[in-house]
Amino acid sequence: MKKYAISSLVTFLFLLSVVPIIAGTLDEVKKRGSLVCGVSTGLPGFSATDEKGNWKGLDVDGCRAIAAAVFGDAKKVKYVPLNAKERFTALQSGEIDVLVRGTTWTKHRDTALGLNFAGVNYYDGQGFMVSKKLGVKSAQELDGAIFCIHAGTTTELNLADYFAKNNMKYEA
């Protein structure tokens, strides 16, 4: 019972510290009259502009839903395209109000960045894609391979971990 009480108290105190930050951002958004939403840099199906310059995709719809909830108008959004390296800095600095783009929710990011993650809205996976002509049957055969990868992503870290654990080398 004592552990439960202490755990509840710690959780309550944490939530008290977060609420003013969230409320402060919401107040700023309402005062400005629009939501500044960070999205991916042209990722079809998630966040990309069409031939008329209109933003489309799952992430864009998330931004619109927030704007509709805050203002009653889904069009009160300014989209800021961000790459993987820029996304957290933009949110931490206040350049954007909310980040709605591909971002893996990790324990480190949840605890070290000072950000609040919302629920997961998309699940994906990782794997290696190689030309069939190479005849590769196992990832163990990729020692010395060269990979194209987005810097600053969880995928980059997972690739490094995989190769280190298997005493293999690669170039990115």
Regions found by a protein language model. Give the residues of each.
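Structured segments of extracytoplasmic/periplasmic soluble domains
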Residues: 32, 40, 65, 69-73, ...
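Ligand-binding cleft/hinge of the Venus flytrap
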Residues: 49-52, 64-75, 117, 155-172
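Soluble non-cytosolic domains of exported or imported proteins
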Residues: 53-61, 82-85, 149-154
